């Protein structure tokens, strides 16, 4: 039985960091003579290869490197990978803004796909919502820079962040971690593995994060909640034969994030708010709050033969996202021009609070079939077929009511052939055809 329990407490992080820095440096010097070069194996081309043999700009991060580098979230990957900048969007809960080689997209709008793709367990996220996630339960992380349309079902111009989570082990095991800090911060997460007869296993996972804002609200004389996040998941693996297996996973999540706004009162009509006197304080009574609630389902079926592998991946994402802000009804808002070209405006009721909501419902369903060779000879290839259906519905109000529906139906065929000319040179040729 594999049992691991970890407790962490984050108090006075600056002092602790200064105290431990000399110890860390000393440990590195002591290990310098005994540490050698370790071969890094990546799966950028759907097969296990040495990173030196892959003609792709890829950075691979192991779970050990994540732990040693204190990389706990997908937002932290930019600390270890060059040419990568990651941060959470200004609005939206658990929505990521990813930039690779200067190509980025920083919005929660679903009608525009992000320039940097994120794939979790082989499923491409058609939106950047949900791109902020914990790295507690990962087997490997690879960051590929540049277009990857010949290797992945969904193409992106900036690159791909490819994350593979651990599969059920089929044995009893547990991994727990608890973190506490100031501003009432708490983070509890864990994984429980159990056998499923002698043919597979079950994995249960959970995570709960709560914390108050670092900004003190002078109107409420208190700190309001900043983040309240809860995620629960289950994964079932079944081995039909020695060479054929299936993994079915389901995740349910509920996130809430509150932004401590400091809004200039002259920002726009209908937006009454006070400007903060100090960046650590805010007088705003009703700040912007974002909610993200949904569920993900993934099915992966793999068949391994002597010199090839066939894999089928299905992914379903269904979630709702709400951005809400309360405003003070003063002034007016513009309606545009009338038929004579005269500006038209509508007055608001002075002294009335009203909420401005931006609701989005999003659902995507994807199917991908991959065929990957593993020949002993100089030639190998990867080929696949990819299908994606995604639709989003957005509504907003009450000041300016509007609705919009966006739909994507995409089918693609992709592939890449590599040939080793000799021990030094190799040739790789890829192609892709997409109908959308």
Question: At which residue positions do the language-model features occur?
Answer:
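N-terminal Sec signal peptide and the immediately downstream disordered periplasmic leader
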Residues: 1-69, 75-81, 193, 242, ...
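Extracytoplasmic beta-strand/coil segments of soluble accessory domains associated
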Residues: 43, 79-123
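Non-catalytic regulatory/gating segments with a bias toward low-complexity or hydrophobic composition
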Residues: 58, 66, 78, 141-146, ...
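N-terminal periplasmic accessory domains that precede
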Residues: 74-77, 97-101, 119, 140-143, ...
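Short acidic/polar hinge/loop motifs at secondary-structure boundaries
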Residues: 77, 108-109, 116, 121-147
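Outer-membrane beta-barrel translocator domains and adjoining extracellular loop/strand segments
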Residues: 131, 209, 214-222, 259-265, ...
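Transmembrane beta-barrel wall of Gram-negative outer-membrane proteins
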Residues: 173-175, 180-211, 215-260, 295, ...
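Flexible loop and strand-edge segments within Gram-negative outer membrane beta-barrel domains
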Residues: 245, 249-294, 356-360, 386, ...
């Amino acid at each position: 039985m594999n049992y691991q329990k970890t407790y962490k407490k984050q108090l006075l992080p600056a002092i602790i960091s200064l105290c431990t820095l000399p110890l860390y440096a000393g440990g590195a010097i002591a290990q310098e003579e005994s540490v050698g070069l370790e071969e890094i194996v990546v799966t950028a081309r759907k097969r296990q290869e040495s990173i030196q043999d892959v003609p792709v700009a890829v950075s691979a991060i192991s779970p050990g490197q994540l732990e040693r580098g204190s990389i706990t979230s997908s937002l932290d990957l930019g600390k270890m990978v060059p040419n990568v900048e990651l941060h959470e969007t200004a609005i939206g809960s658990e929505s990521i803004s990813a930039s690779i080689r200067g190509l980025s997209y920083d919005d929660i709008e679903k009608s525009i796909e992000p320039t940097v793709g994120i794939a979790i367990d082989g499923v491409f996220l058609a939106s950047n919502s949900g791109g902020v996630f914990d790295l507690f339960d990962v087997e490997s992380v690879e960051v590929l820079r540049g277009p990857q349309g010949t290797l992945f079902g969904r193409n992106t111009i900036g690159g791909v962040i490819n994350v593979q989570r651990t599969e059920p082990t089929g044995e009893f095991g547990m991994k727990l971690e608890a973190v506490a800090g100031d501003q009432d911060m708490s983070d509890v997460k864990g994984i429980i593995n159990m056998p499923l007869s002698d043919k597979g296993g079950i994995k249960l996972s959970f995570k709960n994060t709560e914390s108050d804002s670092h900004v003190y609200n002078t109107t409420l004389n208190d700190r309001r909640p900043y983040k309240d996040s809860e995620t629960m998941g289950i994964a079932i693996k079944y081995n039909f034969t020695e060479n054929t297996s299936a993994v079915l996973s389901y995740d349910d999540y509920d996130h809430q994030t509150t932004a401590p706004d400091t809004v200039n009162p002259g920002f726009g009509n209908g937006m009454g708010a006070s400007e903060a006197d100090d960046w650590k304080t805010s007088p705003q009574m009703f700040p912007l709050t974002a909610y993200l609630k949904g569920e993900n389902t993934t099915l992966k079926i793999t068949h391994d033969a002597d010199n090839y592998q066939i894999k089928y991946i299905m992914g379903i994402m269904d979630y709702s996202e709400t951005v809400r802000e309360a405003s003070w009804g003063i002034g007016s808002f513009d309606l545009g021009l009338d038929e004579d070209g005269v500006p038209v405006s509508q007055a608001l009721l002075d002294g009335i609070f009203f909420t401005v909501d931006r609701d989005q419902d999003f659902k995507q369903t994807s199917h991908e079939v991959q065929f990957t060779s593993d020949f002993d000879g100089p030639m190998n290839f990867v080929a696949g077929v990819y299908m994606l259906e995604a639709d989003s519905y957005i509504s907003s109000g009450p000041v300016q009511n509007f609705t919009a529906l966006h739909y994507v139906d995409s089918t693609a065929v992709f592939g890449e052939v590599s040939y080793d000319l000799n021990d030094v040179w190799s040739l790789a040729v890829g192609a892709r055809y997409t109908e959308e």
